[in-house]
Each structure stands twice: as C-alpha cells, then as structure tokens.
Amino acid sequence: MKVSNLKITNVKTILTAPGGIDLAVVKIETNEPGLYGLGCATFTQRIFAVKSAIDEYMAPFLVGKDPTRIEDIWQSGVVSGYWRNGPIMNNALSGVDMALWDIKGKLAGMPVYDLLGGKCRDGIPLYCHTDGGDEVEVEDNIRARMEEGYQYVRCQMGMYGGAGTDDLKLIATQLARAKNIQPKRSPRSKTPGIYFDPDAYAKSVPRLFDHLRNKLGFGIEFIHDVHERVTPVTAINLAKTLEQYQLFYLEDPVAPENIDWLKMLRQQSSTPISMGELFVNVNEWKPLIDNRLIDYIRCHVSTIGGITPARKLAVYSELNGVRTAWHGPGDISPVGVCANMHLDLSSPNFGIQEYTPMNDALRDVFPGCPEIDHGYAYLNDKPGLGIDIDEAKAAKYPCEGGIPSWTMARTPDGTASRP
C-alpha cells in the first residue's frame, strides 16, 4: 500500500473485559480509509488512569503526525511530559507504539515480525501455569498439560506458595498438606488482605520440586516464580537449594529495590535467573546484563513503552548472551500477546514465552488470536500485528476498575507485603 501525506486523524481507547480482566486497547486511525492500527495499553490495576493519559494527553499529541515516524514519535512521546518512565504513561505510549507498528506493517504488506528481520523459528515454545494446593495437585495439573503437548510449565503451590485467600484456616490446611509446613499465626483484629507466610513458602518450594522430579523426571522444564516475596537472603538460599532440580529458571527472586543482592545470589548459585517483571525502563536491565547477573529478561512489554524499546532490549541482551522471556499474564490483551510473539519470532535469543489460555469470548472480541497447538504458538501471516478488535462485541464486556484483591498482600503479623 502506497499512501502520500499520511496523517493520524484520531486516537481512541477501547476498554473491555471479555476474559474477566480489564484490558485497554489503543486504536489509531489515519486519513487513509480503513487504515488503522491497534496496540495494547493494559495496566489493569490503573486502567482508567491509562485511558485518561491516552485520551487527554497522547491523542492531542498525535493527531496530525505522520504515523510512519515510529522512532521519532516514541522518543518525543517519552519526553513530552518531562518526567518519564512511569507505568501509566509508558502503557499509554505502548498502546500508541504497537498501533504504529501495526500500521507500518499494513502499509508494507508485511507482518511485523518481517519488519523486525523475519522469522528465526517456525513456532513459539510456550510455558503455561500449573498451580495447585499441594504437590500432588500440581503434579496432576502438569500431567494434564504434558498431554496437551506442553514441554515447559510454571509450578506454584497456591498463590506463590500460599493459598491466595484471606482465610487463614484454608491457608493452614493447604500448607499442612505440603508436608506439614505450618504458617505462623496472626494477631487479633486481623486487617483484611491476602495473607502469606514467606518463611513457610520458602520451605515448601524445594519439597514441591523434589516431589515433581521424583514423579515426572527431568524430561519436562520447570519454572518457578518467587514474585519478589521473600527476603534477599531467603532468595539466595532458595536458589542454592533448587540447583539439584535443574529449573529452567527462577523468576524475580528479589524485588527491584534489592537488585544489588543478585551479585551475591549469582556467586552462590547456578540456578538460572529471570528478572524484571516490574521494571519500567529498559536501562534497569543494563547493569544486570552487563554484569552477567541474569539469564533471561523478564519484561512486560507495555510497561516499558512497547515494541520500539523491547526490540532494542532484545538486541542488547543477545549481544551479552541473555535470552528473552516476555511477560504473558492474563492481564495483557490479545493485541499485546501478538506483539510479544512478533518479537519472539524475530529474536535469535528467544528463550521462552509465557502464555495464558484465552477463553472463547476473548477470541470472539479479538479475531486473529494466535493458534496454540501442542505447546507452540503460531501467528497468522497477515500484515501488521495480524489481529483486530470487534468494538461492538468489546462493548458488551465493560471494565469494572478497582484494586485487585491479590495485590492486598500481608505477612502473618499483618504487615503490608509485596503481592
């Protein structure tokens, strides 16, 4: 498609929740009839703030600009608010950035992965979640996924080792099933929240993987997510203990505020490390990559600003022997899923892709979702990102907003904790 004097004419935010999770999609329209792009701007925990950022700030900034000038729009968009690299504006910018890549692909008549250099592989290996209340339930769920063809699984007991509930009796019951590990008691007048005992969790994880390796062997790859919920010293001890179980990687063992501890962890353990789900700036990975402190970049693409910074991060990682592991939870839209996978296909240092199964409503609202077959994802070869949105159907699933209960985490004595 060849178009002269192409301009952005409209920018809008589409909020929808067909999977039960609030999603934000940016649609950029142009003066060429029928030519538009879609991008993911989902920050579920602050969905209406992102919508406001797009509608009130990004839209006026974009209208009248040439949509093919992706790099210039990204760079000027980042600095346009002076203060930069916050998750709300980054997600807003991500929605714009992905939509511009979608438009560029449609203009070129090529999938985005071809614009990024072309395919490096034929399919995208996926890992899925296999949670359970105890070792046997996790094992059963893994066996079910193996029958579906998955070769990589993330293994968790309850909510990152706890029960994902504020019912202390249920937590105690579930942890008791995990080889009689008892969580600490809470004081009187318990503050509402999701209670989690990091010490009981840290004791239960090695027993989980001992059970799984004894029952399932070493023919399946295991991932575990610490979710930054333990002290740095506990994380180091956990990584050391888990070496014998040969994890594919241990995710986010420390909080972003404690990344200096990764040097000590690296000195004491050979367990592969994935880090960065909560990072909001590509430069946060630089010292970890430069000092060989991680094996995988664990990156939420929309929170760093979209495809433009993500492809640079992937290349920098490649030059230093670090592989990609883009974040793929349920709280990114199918548009964001496709953006991840275009990066996956075109990155020689691809490591693995997290995948959360989509229900029928999601696939109905977003035609063009990836095909999933025997643990692999396959994108179509349509120009751009290859995915669309049915706005009328999307409107049938309004967003609710609010604070997700799982983020209201507390330790047994009632102290607020990282979720």
From Swiss-Prot:
The record's annotation in InterPro entries points to:
DgoD-like, Enolase-like_C_sf, Enolase-like_N, Enolase_C-like, Mandel_Rmase/mucon_lact_enz_CS, Mandelate_racemase_C, Mandelate_racemase_N_dom
The residues annotated as site (Important for activity and substrate specificity) are 329
Q: Which GO terms describe its molecular function?
A: gluconate dehydratase activity; magnesium ion binding
Keywords associated with the record: Lyase, Magnesium, Metal-binding
**GO annotation terms (biological process):** amino acid catabolic process; carbohydrate catabolic process
Q: Identify which residues the record assigns to the active site.
A: 160, 227
Enzyme Commission identifier(s): 4.2.1.-, 4.2.1.39
PROSITE patterns, sorted: MR_MLE_1 (PS00908), MR_MLE_2 (PS00909)
What does the record give as the reaction this protein catalyses?
D-gluconate = 2-dehydro-3-deoxy-D-gluconate + H2O
- State the Pfam families in the record: MR_MLE_C (PF13378), MR_MLE_N (PF02746)
Give the top-level enzyme category: lyase
Tell me the residue numbers annotated for binding substrate: 45, 129, 277, 298, 327, 331, 354
Q: How is the cofactor bound?
A: Binds 1 Mg(2+) ion per subunit.
Disulfide-bond pairs as recorded? none
* Cofactor(s) annotated in UniProt: Mg(2+)
Cite the binding residues for Mg(2+): 225, 251, 277
Query: What does the sequence similarity comment in the record state about its family?
Result: Belongs to the mandelate racemase/muconate lactonizing enzyme family. GalD subfamily.
| Subunit structure and binding partners | Homotetramer.
Question: What is this protein for, i.e. what is its function?
Answer: Has low D-gluconate dehydratase activity (in vitro), suggesting that it has no significant role in D-gluconate degradation in vivo. Has no detectable activity with a panel of 70 other acid sugars (in vitro).
What protein am I looking at?
A: D-galactonate dehydratase family member SEN1436
- Organism lineage: Bacteria, Pseudomonadati, Pseudomonadota, Gammaproteobacteria, Enterobacterales
